[in-house]
């Protein structure tokens, strides 16, 4: 199934595979909806090591993140829909773009990550 999903350019959300061709929602609308629905969202290409580091850091501080793994053509469509020259992986906290791994590390090292996560209700504890 994964090989079929990758070949068809589908997007994986957790264990759910979403076929963008079968949806009426445009990529920009889908990105906006996903960012609004979850306090912490990571958009990444499947297997991206930087996204893995981001997930580990967020989990280490007690945050629950929604991770949207993109494959094939879906990755390019969603990346373009992020706008502003955003590249994958891309992190959003409370609907605001943080950036990639460097942005996340900057927040963490400055001591602003946990307070921001607490502010948006993303901490498990």
Swiss-Prot record:
Annotated GO MF terms: 2 iron, 2 sulfur cluster binding; metal ion binding
Cross-referenced InterPro entries: GlrX-like_pln_2, Thioredoxin-like_sf
UniProt: [2Fe-2S] cluster binding residues: 48
Keyword Cytoplasm: yes
Similarity field: Belongs to the glutaredoxin family. CC-type subfamily.
GO CC list: cytoplasm
Alphabetically ordered keywords of this record: 2Fe-2S, Cytoplasm, Iron, Iron-sulfur, Metal-binding, Redox-active center
Subcellular location: Cytoplasm
Highest taxon of source: Eukaryota
Protein name per UniProt: Monothiol glutaredoxin-S2
Main localization, broad class: cytoplasm
Residue ranges of every copy of the Glutaredoxin domain listed in the record: 28-124
Keyword Iron-sulfur attached: yes
Role noted for this protein: May only reduce GSH-thiol disulfides, but not protein disulfides.
NCBIfam families, A to Z: GlrX-like_plant
């Amino acid at each position: 199934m994964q090989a079929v999903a990758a070949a068809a350019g589908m997007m994986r959300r957790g264990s759910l595979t979403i076929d963008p061709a079968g949806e009426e929602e445009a990529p920009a609308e889908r990105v906006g909806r996903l960012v609004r629905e979850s306090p912490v969202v990571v958009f990444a290409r499947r297997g991206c090591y930087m996204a893995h580091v981001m997930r580990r850091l967020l989990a280490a501080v007690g945050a629950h993140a929604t991770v949207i793994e993109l494959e094939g053509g879906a990755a390019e469509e969603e990346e373009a829909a992020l706008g502003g020259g955003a590249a994958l992986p891309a992190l959003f906290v409370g609907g605001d773009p943080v950036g990639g791994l460097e942005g996340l590390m900057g927040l963490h090292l400055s001591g602003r990550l946990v307070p921001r996560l607490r502010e948006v209700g993303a901490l498990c504890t």
